[in-house]
Structure formats: C-alpha cells, structure tokens
From Swiss-Prot:
Binds 1 zinc ion per subunit. The zinc ion is important for the structural integrity of the protein. GO terms for cellular component: cytoplasm. Keywords: Metal-binding, Oxidoreductase, Zinc. This is Peptide methionine sulfoxide reductase MsrB. It catalyses: L-methionyl-[protein] + [thioredoxin]-disulfide + H2O = L-methionyl-(R)-S-oxide-[protein] + [thioredoxin]-dithiol. The keyword Metal-binding applies. Its cofactor is Zn(2+). Belongs to the MsrB Met sulfoxide reductase family. GO terms for biological process: protein repair; response to oxidative stress. Zn(2+) binds at C46, C49, C95, C98. It comes from the Bacteria. GO terms for molecular function: peptide-methionine (R)-S-oxide reductase activity; zinc ion binding.
Amino acid sequence: MANKPSAEELKKNLSEMQFYVTQNHGTEPPFTGRLLHNKRDGVYHCLICDAPLFHSQTKYDSGCGWPSFYEPLSEESIRYIKDLSHGMQRIEIRCGNCDAHLGHVFPDGPQPTGERYCVNSASLRFTDGENGEEING
C-alpha cells in the first residue's frame, strides 16, 4: 500500500463527506454525488492517492444513485474485501494503492463482465481526457 496522508492532513484537505466515505467506509446519499451524471470522456482516479481506477467508457447509468462501472482499469486498481455489515453479504471495493474505501461490487451489471462497481463520487477525482480538467467528487 502506498503511503497515504495522516488522518489530520486528510481532515484538513477533504470535505466531511469525502473523509467519511474514504476513511470510515461510509456511503454518500444516493443521487447526490457530483460525478453521478458526468458523461465526459476521461479517467476516474482515487481521490486520496490519484491512482487511476476506472475509464469513462466503462461507466453506465445503473439507476442505483451512484456512479457505476462494469470494469476497473486493471485488477491491481481495486482491492476486494468481504463485507458482512448491516446484515448483508457484499464485496467492498477499495483503492488497490492506498486502501481508501470506494464502494461495493455486485454481480448484476451489464456485459461484458456482468459486474456493477457501485462507487461513491466522494471517493473519486475525474480527469477530463480532452482538456485535463479535474473534478473532485
């Protein structure tokens, strides 16, 4: 795992929601994330360490209220953790580089993978493929 900033540094540089999601395994309210409706071409990075996670070509509207992707950029991009919280069986996804919480993956996505990576906007930074503009979720 990469060296990540201290909790104090993160609290100073992140919004309350960004800290809650990435560091406390929280979930932003559905349909509120800044990147939910983003349709521009580019790459979604980890907000904490800037590791590339998802390409916009794999993003789709699942109707669940969070940005959804059917595949990460690489297997190394994502770390998978069994999550038995809240009386459910789920697979948590974390940044493969810094271990920040991203969301969960479910087996109900579209082809070609059949997977839905349900990701909190608050854990992402989008970089526009045309002009390099960055947008924090």
